[in-house]
Regions:
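Flavin-binding catalytic cores
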Residues: 121-124, 323-324, 356-360, 380-381, ...
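Extreme N-terminal leader/targeting segments of oxidoreductases
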Residues: 1-9, 27-28, 471-478, 520-530
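A glycine-rich dinucleotide-binding beta-alpha-beta segment and adjacent secondary-structure elements
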Residues: 192-211, 360-368, 424, 429-498
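A conserved FAD-binding loop/helix module that cradles the flavin
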Residues: 495-516
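Mid-domain catalytic core of redox enzymes
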Residues: 263-379
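Helical element adjacent to the flavin cofactor pocket in flavoenzyme catalytic cores
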Residues: 221-268
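Rossmann-like flavin
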Residues: 99-213
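N-terminal glycine-rich phosphate/pyrophosphate-binding loop and immediately adjacent elements
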Residues: 2-147, 463-465
Length: 530
């Protein structure tokens, strides 16, 4: 039997939330241990040469606006910079390319965006300014929902602040607007379908579809965040963020270990698969509810049986002999993320097809171009593309285009490559030199993603469905919302918990904040000593 080790905090899983939490705790003087089952730190953050030597791909997640704009980075950013984290940014964060070759872009200032939207509809620029005029005075409330432990005194205080500022009727109206769908917001606010198609794909990055409740709120939050913060990425790849966090934890006396499989969590510590017990006052689990309640905590197997996962995704990575030459607007070649879609209805249709178990006939294609900011990702003169498809089923019932025999309805290598060919043929219509410049292509199906990272359950990168009953106040479970678990001293963080998915570290920061908050006894003692 291995000897037991003891820490203040053990973090199970080194995703962005686990690492952010551990770094905040370690920097505050607590003795922290991070245990990761994979052979790399970072969870869905991984940079690797998976196509050709010299081409450094962000294998899963790639874009860091939520992190750079979040509270964890605000507290840790200077220290992480000392450990080699250097962010690059762009004035062309995103755009949408339509089948007819027309395009629309989201830029970095209100005036630029108003002018861009006016190209498509004479009143859309004014509508954009009006949206900003309504959003910014209450931005602390809008962003506060995503940066507050909702089941807490601070969460209640957010509601009190809204009532005091807006009045009861105004606060009720504000809360109601948070639940509007992206379709209803876009079609009410803007006259051009080009504007609708520019903003609608972004709700996919939150795990929602454009007809889902609260997708309008999330679309506005992302639109404002992109305008104000751009699309930052770390020089050298996303792995630089994970590496810097690990270095900071170790600098402050913490321990970080890979290839350690934790198979049991309990009040007071964890047990590893090789029989070691690691004791801790607090255990923070960066896992899904399926893992936490179905495997790690004994006696709670039924608790997460009703938890639902969302749509699956697929990644495609290209190493190219030359940069992609986009047709139409020259700005496309300089844009960090380009969405290929027919527009709002196209996104809605693809989401609906995936929800019904069909391979979408015309999926939204997310084309990431990290070389627009970071030339170190590929050899000089070469090209690199990061492709994400967010509207896919886990269990496949059919093909909406009627082209594929889906066999037993599972993701096979053959089906993965055939679907990648469908996407590639669409890309080639807009990038004529694509096929002639391909050095290598690596595709990862939902099954591949789940095999690579247990938290990508069923290929869902967003930690579970974000339907209203599994979102905000009810995330991850209506019976167990927030970050506490039924077991004292065991906490739950990650995309499956509030504030949900995205590379931001929000849930990790919220749990660290609670653990570092003085206890009632400490606060009382402090008042007596004044």
């Amino acid at each position: 039997m291995l000897l037991s080790r003891a820490y203040d905090d053990v973090v199970v899983g080194s995703g962005i939330n686990g690492l952010a939490c551990a770094a905040l705790l370690a920097r505050s003087g607590r003795h922290v241990c991070v245990l990761e089952r994979n052979d790399w730190f970072g969870g869905a953050i991984k940079t690797d040469e998976i196509t050709e030597p010299g081409f450094r791909h962000d294998v899963f997640s790639a874009w860091h606006p939520l992190w750079v704009g979040g509270q964890a980075h605000a507290q840790l950013g200077a220290d992480l910079a000392r450990h080699g984290l250097d962010y690059l940014n762009t004035d062309l964060p995103t755009g949408t390319l339509y089948p007819d070759g027309e395009s629309a872009f989201l830029l970095r200032t209100a005036d630029e965006n108003a002018a861009e939207l006016d190209r498509h509809h004479a009143d859309d620029g004014d509508a954009w300014r009006a949206m900003l005029g309504e959003f910014f005075p209450n931005a602390d409330l809008a962003f506060g929902i995503l940066g507050t432990e909702l089941w807490s005194r601070q969460g209640a205080g957010l509601g009190v602040k809204a009532v005091r500022r807006l009045g009861r009727q105004g606060a009720a109206e504000f809360a109601g607007r948070l639940l509007i769908s992206a379709r209803d917001w876009l079609e009410t606010a803007f006259g051009s379908e080009r504007t609708h198609g520019l903003l609608a794909p972004w709700v996919l990055h939150t795990g929602l579809g454009p007809d889902a409740a609260a997708s309008g709120y999330m679309a506005q939050v992302i639109a404002v965040a992109v305008q104000e913060g751009g699309m930052p990425i770390p020089r050298g790849g996303g792995q630089k963020l994970a590496d810097a966090l690990v270095a900071l934890i170790r600098e402050n006396g913490g321990t970080c270990e890979t290839s350690v499989h934790v198979d049991r969590v309990f009040s007071g510590g964890v047990r590893t698969a090789d029989g070691e017990t690691v004791s801790a006052t607090e255990v923070i689990c960066n896992v899904t509810p399926t893992q936490l309640y179905g495997e790690l905590l004994e006696g709670y197997e039924d608790k997460a049986k009703g938890f639902r996962y969302g749509r699956s995704e697929m990644q495609i990575h290209y190493a190219l002999s030359e940069p992609p030459r986009w047709e139409a607007d020259e700005r496309l070649a300089r844009t960090a993320i380009v969405h290929l879609t027919p527009g709002l209805d196209g996104v809605s249709r693809a989401v609906n097809e995936a929800d019904r178990g069909l391979l979408p006939a015309e999926a939204t294609v997310v084309v990431g171009q990290p070389l627009t900011m970071d030339e170190s990702r590929a050899p000089e003169g070469k090209g690199l593309l990061w492709i994400q498809l967010q509207e896919l089923p886990w269990r496949i019932k059919g093909d909406a285009a009627g082209e594929f025999d889906i066999g037993a309805g599972e993701w096979t290598e053959e089906l993965r490559e055939r679907y990648a060919e469908r996407i590639q043929s669409r890309l080639t219509r807009h990038i004529p030199n694509l096929e002639s410049s391909i050095l290598a292509r690596t595709a990862l199906s939902p099954a591949d993603l789940q095999a690579a990272n247990i938290n990508l359950h069923q290929g869902d990168p967003y930690g579970g469905s974000l339907a209203l009953d599994q979102n905000f106040l009810w995330r991850p479970l209506g019976s167990q919302p927030g970050h506490r678990t039924p077991v004292p001293g065991v906490w739950h963080v990650g995309a499956s918990t509030h504030p949900g998915p995205g590379l931001g570290g929000g849930s990790g920061a919220l749990v660290a904040q609670q653990l570092l908050k003085p206890s009632l006894a400490e606060r009382a003692r402090g008042r007596l000593l004044r």
